[in-house]
Amino acid sequence: KGLDVLIRAMRLLGPRYRLIIAGEPYGSFEKYDELISESGDSSRFFIYPQYIRDSEVKKYFCAADLTVLPYKSATQSGISAVSNHFEKPMVVTDVGGLKETIGDRGTGIVCKKCTPECVAEAIENYFDHPERKEEFVSNIRKENERLSWNRFCKNLTEFINTLNAK
């Protein structure tokens, strides 16, 4: 998932940055604990390495300003849909369909490379330009409306009506 890249990116970011790591890891979390220890300031990391129940997801997203998905490989990510639900802009790497669902829709920043430097730069870019948050959140709201059940039902009803008219 690229968590190692994000932890290394935190080393490059100033002390004002904090990172919430939430969710059940694939395999042992030991290697990430080591990277966090090597970062020099483990107090900047808030770690919840367990399965997150649906009823608990909200508190993690409400505590966050930004969702970062530094994936090394992926086709899509369910986390991006959850992030949109909570109107959180994203920093993602250019893998799978993330560029199309995030970058092309203007709901976040796409890193050209999955490196700590690129991820750190994108995170800083987001926080150094607060006006971008408004733009991203506005685009997320439009995307949420486009993908809403209300829109789906409206389109389906219109389609059925065209069939009935024939």
Question: Model-flagged regions — what are they?
Answer:
Residues R18-Y32, Q50:
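Glycosyltransferase donor-sugar binding loop
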Residues K1-L12, A81, E117:
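A conserved mid-protein helix/loop that constitutes part of the nucleotide-sugar donor-binding site
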Residues P89-V92, I102:
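Short hydrophobic beta-strand element within catalytic cores of glycosyltransferases
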Residues K59-T75, K88:
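Acidic donor-binding loop of glycosyltransferase active sites
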Residues N125, H129, R146-K166:
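C-terminal alpha-helical cap of glycosyltransferases
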Residues Y32-K58:
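Nucleotide-activated donor-binding/catalytic signature segment of Leloir-type glycosyltransferases, i.e.
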Residues D104-R105, I109-P116, N125-E131:
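Conserved acidic donor-binding segment of nucleotide-sugar-dependent glycosyltransferases
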Residues R132-R146:
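A short, well-ordered alpha-helix in the C-terminal region of glycosyltransferases
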